Design a protein with these regions (language model features):
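C-terminal glycine/acidic-rich active-site capping loop/insertion
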Residues: 174
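Acidic, metal/ion-coordinating pockets
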Residues: 1-167, 171
Length: 177
């Protein structure tokens, strides 16, 4: 979200975390239809995701970040399109279309992950894990020193309740059903 006129941004557009001595940027993106799908505050302004992503990647790279993850609510097709159009993003973790990606589930719409290539030819991994907290996305990625994914392995984990130790919240369960 861009700043309100004369003000500060309503949210942080990205964060930088450090893991194993590496700076990792995580960028949040939602679709421009959010105001008609949700009830954001009236000050919120939603712009083009691609523009926001390009600006975020440039800023993150200037801060020495060489692994960028886009956490999106744009839909699988948009994530895949952006993966092929925007340099500097390594992984898209997406939602919105409730698409199932899997290497083992015959109902999947594609493999987990989908591998696209950035304009500069680097691999970009796209993952999503359906909807309603029925699956938990899981992927392990080996990056080289330049932050380029070299190897990866993953598969969504079915959350079937077999090891549940906390009773379900009735109100939340009703909303998910």
């Amino acid at each position: 979200l861009p700043p309100v006129p004369g003000g500060k941004p309503l949210t942080r557009p990205w964060i930088v975390v450090e893991r194993q001595g590496r700076k990792i940027g995580i960028v949040g993106l939602v679709n421009e239809e959010t105001p008609s799908l949700a009830s954001p505050c009236k000050e919120a302004v939603f712009g083009p995701a691609e523009t926001a992503l390009r600006e975020a990647v440039a800023s993150l790279r200037a801060q020495g970040v060489n692994i960028v993850i886009a956490l999106t609510h744009l839909g699988l097709n948009v994530d895949c399109e952006l993966a092929g159009r925007v340099d500097g993003v390594d992984v898209f973790v997406g939602g919105h279309t409730h698409s199932l990606l899997s290497n083992t589930n015959p109902k999947a719409v594609g493999p987990y992950p989908i591998v696209k290539h950035s304009p500069s030819g680097e691999p970009v991994l796209v993952v999503t894990a359906a909807s309603s907290c029925k699956l938990l996305g899981h992927i392990a990625i080996d990056f080289n020193d330049a932050g380029i994914a070299q190897r990866w392995n993953g598969e969504p984990i079915v959350l079937d309740g077999r090891n549940v130790t906390v009773p379900p919240d009735a109100k939340l369960s009703a909303r998910l059903d």
